[in-house]
């Protein structure tokens, strides 16, 4: 467990440390329900929120506003803030760690134009993410969250709670990233556009309602466990361009086998 209190200083309800002439908030120890993180402490800009900074004493917080001075939000920063319903990110936030909203009540989140990196984005599946139109790194169509890359888009996550049964992945997508659809309970049909060349590990694992997926010519790689536990899958036609079929990509599904379910090689 993190314990850096020997190097911490206290200001109001915040324990912090100084790093490169800026402030890193290490711990919040207040009792407010509506928290506005300060942009400055003792004349220095607040740049970072440390991992799990609000996790210990934040169970009753309902709303948090992060100022534009903050560029980095650490892993699990608001984890276990069980009453948290709203997280407001101002322009300036660049990087957001993993498990930031684990065990919170947040269902919607707006990503400003400055956000450039989400760590483990598939963990955001229960949150409806709205992305600033001018953001150069991500966009959302209301269901899928995409990362913009030099060679096209990567679908990095879909909304786990969305009850739609059909989805067409955005054109210009080249990669379906690992865990992107994992555990989505409702989706039955997915169409991948021409240009998708790779489906990464566990991308559709445990999509137990998935019946049909269109795999385009040009697809070269299906990684390990991609369709594992897709027990409703009725058939799968593998394109002629496929070069790499990962371990357990279409097997190891509680007795389900390619020959029984119309897999065509």
Language-model-derived ranges and their functions:
Residues 52-58:
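Short secondary-structure subsegments characteristic of cysteine-rich extracellular domains
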Residues 1-5:
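Gram-positive cell-envelope targeting signals
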């Amino acid at each position: 467990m993190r314990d850096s209190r020997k190097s911490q200083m206290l200001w109001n309800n915040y324990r912090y440390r100084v790093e490169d002439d800026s402030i890193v908030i290490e711990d919040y120890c207040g009792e407010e329900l509506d928290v506005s993180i300060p942009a400055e402490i003792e004349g220095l800009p607040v740049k970072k929120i440390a991992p799990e900074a609000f996790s210990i004493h934040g169970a009753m917080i309902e709303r948090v506003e992060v100022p534009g001075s903050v560029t980095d939000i650490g892993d699990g920063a608001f984890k276990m803030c069980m009453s948290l319903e709203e997280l407001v990110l101002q322009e300036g936030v660049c990087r957001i760690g993993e498990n930031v909203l684990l065990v919170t009540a947040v269902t919607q989140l707006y990503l400003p134009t400055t956000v450039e990196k989400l760590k483990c984005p598939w963990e955001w599946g229960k949150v409806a993410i709205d992305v600033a139109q001018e953001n150069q790194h991500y966009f959302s169509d209301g269901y899928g969250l995409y990362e913009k890359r030099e060679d096209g888009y990567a679908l990095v996550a879909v909304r786990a709670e969305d009850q739609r049964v059909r989805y067409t992945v955005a054109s210009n997508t080249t990669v379906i990233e690992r865990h992107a659809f994992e555990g989505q309970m409702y989706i039955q049909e997915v169409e991948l556009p021409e240009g998708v060349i790779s489906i990464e590990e566990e991308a559709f694992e445990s999509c137990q309602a998935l019946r049909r997926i269109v795999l385009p010519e040009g697809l070269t790689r299906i990684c390990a466990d991609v369709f594992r536990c897709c027990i409703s899958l009725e058939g799968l036609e593998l394109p002629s361009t496929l070069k790499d079929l990962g371990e357990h990509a279409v097997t190891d599904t509680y007795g389900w086998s390619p020959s029984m379910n119309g897999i065509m090689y």
